[in-house]
Amino acid sequence: TLNVIKDLPYKVYIFCPESEKKDYLKKYKGKYTITRGSDKSLNDANNAVHKYFPTNKKILFMDDDIKSVNKWNGEAFETADLKYYIEEGFRLCNENNFKLFGFYPVKNGFFMKEQKEYSKGLQFCMGGIMGVVNDKELRTTTYKEDYERCIINYIKYGGIIRFNYVKV
């Protein structure tokens, strides 16, 4: 993941279990902000991020195992400009009064080819990478927290943005 984001001009926070914090500090102190996430579950870790940042702060969640971000060009996958999609995602959220954007859940050009560049409304965005405008009231409680996060954002804000040609 750090290779994917190393050239982005944003401040990076690494939320990690207390048991791993010392190793992260040793390796990345001064380059990234290292703070405690949760020792319990991914869901608890994501809720810790929401709690850490102020309301309406723009946050990009990324799991630690992301190796690339790819875009379907109609014929093949190519490297996507992640900075563009982060900025466009937050712009579209602002324009539509939404608080969440994400990416297509499967890397399959066959299914992507009939899609629009992005869609609005209720659709699934996989939790490995998604942008949110922080709402401290929205907490997830289940194992499938990415499904739940999409649904509760749809219920509260009327939809989410999903980029249909982009997959990690």
How does the language model describe each region?
Residues 1-9, 20-26:
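Short, well-formed alpha-helical segments that are part of the catalytic scaffolds
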Residues 3, 166-168:
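Short, intrinsically disordered, charge-balanced linker/junction segments flanking boundaries
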Residues 11, 58, 159:
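Residues at the starts of beta-strands that form the adenosine-phosphate
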Residues 11-18, 101:
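Short, hydrophobic beta-strand segments that form beta-sheet elements in well-ordered domains
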Residues 15-62, 67-81:
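Active-site-proximal specificity loops/subdomain of glycosyltransferases
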Residues 56, 95-99, 158:
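Short, high-confidence coil segments that cap the C-terminus of an alpha-helix
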Residues 69-148:
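Conserved catalytic core of nucleotide-sugar-dependent glycosyltransferases
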Residues 142-166:
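A short, conserved alpha-helix in the catalytic core of glycosyltransferases
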